[in-house]
Regions:
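Accessory C-terminal helicase-associated subdomains
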Residues: 423-522, 526-530, 540-544, 624, ...
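P-loop NTPase Walker
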Residues: 1-97, 272-275, 568
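ATPase/helicase motor core of nucleic-acid motors
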Residues: 252, 296-298, 327-456, 462-466
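C-terminal accessory regions
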Residues: 410, 414, 537-639
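Conserved helicase core region in the C-terminal RecA-like lobe
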Residues: 78-87, 199-203, 228, 339, ...
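Accessory N-terminal region flanking or inserted into the helicase ATPase core
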Residues: 1-30, 47-49, 115-203, 209-217, ...
């Protein structure tokens, strides 16, 4: 590709802004050509930094850099912004100087913290939203001043969260950006500000306002800052991503703008459907995507099943037919759903059929108490004073994590300058601590300590067998990771590191030999010949949890962008699947709205009527007419 791609590569402008739609080749043919040109002109690789938000996008950048046949390419760093900030803070001892510890909380550990802080901060959902605002530097809107909490409740919340984290010698991964921003903004002599000549940023629309400002700070002394993105693909409002940031950057007077609209990935009819969909976005004023091959048509189906079990059966049958009779490689199949449960059931069914498959849902290995307990025990085997791990064990088996009792323990410890582990240890030895009674916590502490002491006597293979027994379905994935780790592990800490890395990073490969099942969010940056979008019903796509009109409207807008991303993953075939009914319990758990008059009894369960996602009606004349699932399966069998 030439034209805008070549112009991006050749530009010597100090600031370059690229607005590029999905599948337009901006990364491979624009940004990578730019890096290759800089290297060929003598720029040292370690003076070039490539940044993206997601690990998938960063891994894609690393792969493409590795393909450059230019001296110095091996020294170019391609990473996520969070990974870069963490390494910067560790290297410059900023964390140590500020008394912070790089013990990163997992999601379930973070939720325990949010329950423990107390206060009138609403439900756990409200608290998650508030902590994301904290991690975004309180930049909930682009007009907010990054890094500053203005609201009194926000200030109190921030103080309580930081006190918990300091007391537990832990931090949230999202903290590294605000800390790095504060450090670099207030230390103009920092070496990092002189370390870069060229900064290239991909997927800029996924960053929040604080992160976007941090990149401006990082590029203070750089020769060039090249930013690429697409506001139509901004899908991270949960962490206050700023889609208007890319529009504002490209329109600045000091920025050389470029646009790419020709899509070489998807067939013309799928591109037309995607264009029709995104044209319904509020206040959108952009040119439509243009197919590279106007006469290339994809195989598109929109199907509806009688209920969710029928949908799972049908999709599994279709994939089995793809892999078997049609000889489609499993790695060419991508299954996307906003409903984790249906995705996990599809994965399990494919696995039963011996079809290679992996799912990629956030920390899914730790969805059960058994998984959380196993990892917490392993952490304590490795490090006896891992307080967040003990906090997990103290709260297991109770919906609130025994947060009331734990708050009493924390309050006593703060007043007495005691470590919670020391307090529990002293009470277990028979000492009475004035005014403190937490029998449930003490019982679980003693049980945990006994198990940890026993586990420390075992060699690595037996340690894995006891923590992750082979007969547990809930622990099967964790056990698989641990067994793989045993091949090279020399100590328990090696197994723990491999488990934590696999569970929290969970990098999705671009070219695997297995079917990939994941959320629509996780699909960003991926491409597949065959894409199945499953569970496409109102209430799931979009998922709207807020009762506030403005927030609900924003969620609906982002849901459309999310569906747009999903459609444009497809290279050859696309199946959009929905059901006409789901279990009442599932509808309530997911917050799906339904008419009570549609509740029906089906055996020992109740179902409610569902309708297809409202976005399906926005796909335009290029979309095929919907059909019943069974009829669709029958028609596939005859072709």
């Amino acid at each position: 590709m030439d034209g805008p791609h070549l112009a991006i590569a050749a530009s010597d402008a100090p600031k370059i802004g690229v607005m590029a739609g999905p599948g337009t080749g901006k990364t491979k043919y624009g940004l990578m050509r730019r890096v290759a040109r800089l290297l060929s002109e003598g720029v040292r690789g370690n003076r070039i930094l490539l940044i993206s938000f997601t690990r998938v996008a960063a891994a894609d950048l690393r792969d493409k850099v590795a393909e450059l046949d230019v001296p110095g390419a091996e020294d170019v760093r391609a990473t996520t912004l969070h990974a870069y900030c963490l390494s910067l803070l560790m290297r410059d001892s900023v964390l140590a100087l500020t008394g912070r510890h790089p013990r990163i909380l997992m999601n379930h550990e973070r939720d325990l913290m949010l329950r423990d802080v107390g206060g009138d901060f609403g439900s756990i959902h409200d608290r998650r939203r508030r902590v994301e605002a904290l991690l975004a530097g309180w930049a909930r809107r682009t007009a907010d001043h990054p890094g500053v909490a203005v609201d009194d409740d926000d200030r109190v919340f921030e103080r309580e969260v930081l006190r918990w984290l300091l007391f537990h010698r832990a931090m949230l991964i999202g903290e590294v950006v605000p800390i790095a921003h504060r450090y670099l903004s207030t230390n103009p002599a920092a070496e990092e500000l002189e370390a870069l000549d060229h900064l290239v940023v991909d997927e800029y629309q996924d960053l929040n306002a604080l992160e976007q400002d941090l990149l401006e700070v990082l590029s203070t002394h750089a020769s060039t800052l090249c930013v690429a993105g697409d506001d139509d693909q901004s899908i991270y409002s949960v962490r206050y991503a700023n889609p208007s940031g890319i529009r504002a950057f490209v329109s600045r007077d000091d920025v050389e703008p470029h646009g790419i609209v020709v899509c070489g990935r998807s067939p013309a009819n799928i591109i037309e459907m995607a264009n029709s969909l995104i044209e319904h976005a509020v206040d959108r004023d952009k040119p439509a995507l243009v197919p590279l091959e106007a006469d290339r048509q994809g195989d598109v189906s929109i199907v509806q099943w009688t209920d969710v079990p029928s949908e799972i059966d049908g999709i599994v049958s279709a994939i089995a037919d793809d892999v078997g009779r049609r000889e489609v490689e499993p790695g060419d199949i991508l299954v996307l759903t906003n409903w984790r449960r249906i995705g996990e059931r599809i994965r399990a069914r494919l696995d039963d059929l011996d079809i290679p498959v992996r799912s990629y849902f956030t920390e899914e290995e730790l969805a059960s108490d058994d998984g959380r307990e196993a990892v917490a025990l392993l952490r304590l085997v490795v490090k006896a004073n891992d307080l967040p791990a003990m906090r997990v064990l103290l709260g297991l088996g109770e919906a609130s994590g025994r947060s009331g009792a734990y708050r009493r323990l924390l309050s006593h410890c703060l007043d007495s300058s005691l470590d919670p582990l020391d307090a529990l240890r002293r009470m277990a030895a028979g000492e009475r601590l004035a005014g403190l009674k937490v029998p449930a916590l003490l019982e679980r502490y003693e049980r945990a300590e006994n198990r940890v002491q026993h586990l420390r006597t075992l060699d690595l293979p037996n340690l894995v067998d006891e923590l992750l027994p082979p007969d547990s379905d809930d622990l099967a994935n964790l056990r698989g990771i641990a067994l793989d780790s045993l091949e090279a592990a020399e100590a328990a800490v090696d197994v723990l590191d491999d488990i934590v890395s696999a569970v929290t990073q969970d990098d999705v490969p671009q070219n695997p030999n297995f079917v990939r099942v994941m959320s629509l969010h996780k699909s960003k940056g991926l491409t597949a010949n065959s894409v199945y979008v499953v569970g496409s019903v109102a209430g799931i796509l979009p998922t709207i949890t807020s009762t506030h009109q403005a927030e609900a409207e924003a969620a609906a807008e982002e849901g459309r962008r999310l569906f747009y991303v999903a459609l444009t993953r497809a290279v050859h075939s696309l199946v959009i699947s929905a059901s006409a009914a789901m279990d009442l319990a599932d509808a309530n758990a997911r917050g799906v709205k339904y008419d009570k008059s549609t509740i029906r009894r089906s055996g020992d369960r109740f179902t409610v009527r569902t309708i297809t996602s409202p976005y399906i009606a926005e796909l335009g004349p290029s979309a095929p007419r919907g059909e019943r699932g069974n009829s669709w399966l029958a028609s596939r069998a005859s072709t």
